[in-house]
Structure formats: structure tokens, C-alpha cells
A protein has these predicted regions:
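Acidic, negatively charged sequence signal
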Residues: 1-32, 43, 48-110
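Short, acidic, Ser/Thr-enriched surface-loop or helix-capping motifs
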Residues: 36
């Protein structure tokens, strides 16, 4: 048995299934979201100042919005990798383009 950086037990199959992840930070650096393209691996990091200065509603909204951005970017990158491998996956809501990601990123104002 192995342990991850938070001393959580990690089984051997989990060690072998690491997909590429993407990380998105809030502009103020108080919130970080890391996800893989499937959305199964998620890591959230909050700096102490976030819990002191944001209400629960603001925190929930910011986590949801930054998670969406990170997942969109991860899926855009996965679509690109698959297409480079010979598939022809069209841009969809589930597999957005990088332009779609950039457009959504402009709505993140925190």
C-alpha cells in the first residue's frame, strides 16, 4: 500500500491509472482546482484567507465555476490528444475547443 501527499491510502490500481490533469487557480491565488479529463480525479485547495473572506455561497459558486473551467480545459486537451492519435472528435459541449475554454475563462472574475 502506498500513500499520497495527504497520507491517504492509495491502492495499487490507483497508482497505475494516472491520467494527465490540469490545474486552474483563481486570480487571487486563494483557490485551486485540479482535475483529469474524466472528472474522476479532483483536488481542491483553499488558502486560509478564502475561508475567512468569502461567504459559503461565494465559496461554493467559485469552486463550481473554477471546476467547470478546469474540466473544460482538461476535456479540450483530451480531445486534442485523441484527434492527434487519429480520431476525429468534433467540438461538443462535452469536448469543447480551446476557444470555448478561453471564452468561459473570461467570465472568471475572481
Amino acid at each position: 500500500m502506498a500513500f499520497d501527499e495527504l497520507a491517504t491510502a492509495v491502492t495499487e490500481p490507483e497508482l497505475d491509472t494516472h491520467e494527465p490533469t490540469v490545474v486552474e487557480w483563481s486570480g487571487d491565488g486563494l483557490l485551486m482546482i485540479e482535475v483529469d479529463w474524466s472528472g474522476e480525479r479532483v483536488r481542491v485547495q483553499l488558502e486560509p484567507e478564502a475561508t475567512r473572506s468569502w461567504t459559503a455561497e461565494i465559496l461554493a459558486d467559485r469552486i463550481a465555476r473554477l471546476h467547470r473551467l478546469a474540466l473544460m480545459r482538461a476535456r479540450a486537451e483530451q480531445r486534442e490528444r485523441l484527434n492527434e492519435g487519429g480520431l476525429a472528435i468534433e467540438t461538443t459541449a462535452g469536448f469543447p475547443s480551446h476557444a470555448d475554454v478561453d471564452e468561459y475563462r473570461r467570465t472568471i472574475n475572481f
